Every structure is written in C-alpha cells, then in structure tokens.
C-alpha cells in the first residue's frame, strides 16, 4: 500500500489508472492507458517482467487452436495483435518463428490441417495489420526430414510448416 500511495501522490493528483504488476500484460495495459491520455502508475513487487512473463513460452500466437472451436472473433483479434506487434509496435523485438506439423495419417490429415492453416493465413492477411509472417507451406516426407531428421520416416507422410511469432517480452516491457 505504501508503494501505491507513493505512486499516486508523486504529482499530488489522483490517478486514473493504477496497474499492479509490470509483466507483459501489465506493461501493455499501462502503455494503452497512457496512450489514451490517462494518468497512470505502474507498480511491481520485484523487477519488470520477473514473474509470469519470465517463465512464458514467449509466443505471440494468432490463436490457431481456436479455429477448431470456430471462435473466429478471437482468432481475428489475436492475429491483428500479432500483426501489430510484428509490424508497428515492436518489429525489433518480435520475430516470426517456424513450426513443423508432422503428418502421419494418409487420407484426411493433410487436407484438414492444410485447410485450417489456409484459413489462418487468409484471416491474417485481411486483418487490420499485415500478416507479418510467411504463409504456411506443405512439405513432402523428404522435405520434412530435411528440416527434422529425427522424425520417424516410417510414420511420416509429410508435414506442414507454418509460422507464428516470438517476443523478447522482458525487453518489450522495459
């Protein structure tokens, strides 16, 4: 409470927003509040990005798994935020990161996963901001094994390479 009182009394005025926790979400919330002209204080118990943010996967994903649940609004929002980070807010801290989806079922898997990733890419391209990452690509068994030689060739029919993004969140919050 002493820290919060000190943060609010520095200027002698009441705060519009007090954000507790200076991880990636808290810092982003404070930045958003300040950019809207609100008087804002950000307090952290330890160091910036030292809590949950320090133990995250660092992924900035577009919500691919939510396509299967037909939550298109959430996917659209996540893709727009990813594109905004990649192209406007922090292109120096956010970078595309490739993923390899191994295909093991002969008949249905490639068209099913491929259609989902095509929709994912299309939603990213028609969003408010640029996609920011390369489009997905279908690979043969040989192409997949070139990228990931430890995959079991006897179980593999091919793969699909797609992209999301990764952020240096400790630098993003400071």
Regions found by a protein language model. Name each.
Residues 1-17, 32-36:
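Extreme N-terminal leader/targeting segments of oxidoreductases
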Residues 18-20, 41:
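Beta-strand elements within well-structured catalytic alpha/beta cores of enzymes
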Residues 22-23, 45:
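Glycine-rich Rossmann-fold phosphate-binding loop(s) that bind the pyrophosphate
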Residues 26-27:
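N-terminal Rossmann-fold NAD(P) dinucleotide-binding loop
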Residues 34-55:
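Glycine-rich FAD pyrophosphate-binding loop
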Residues 58-147:
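Dinucleotide-binding Rossmann-like beta1-alpha1 core, especially the glycine-rich loop
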Residues 125-135, 145-174:
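Helix-loop-beta segment of a Rossmann-like dinucleotide-binding subdomain
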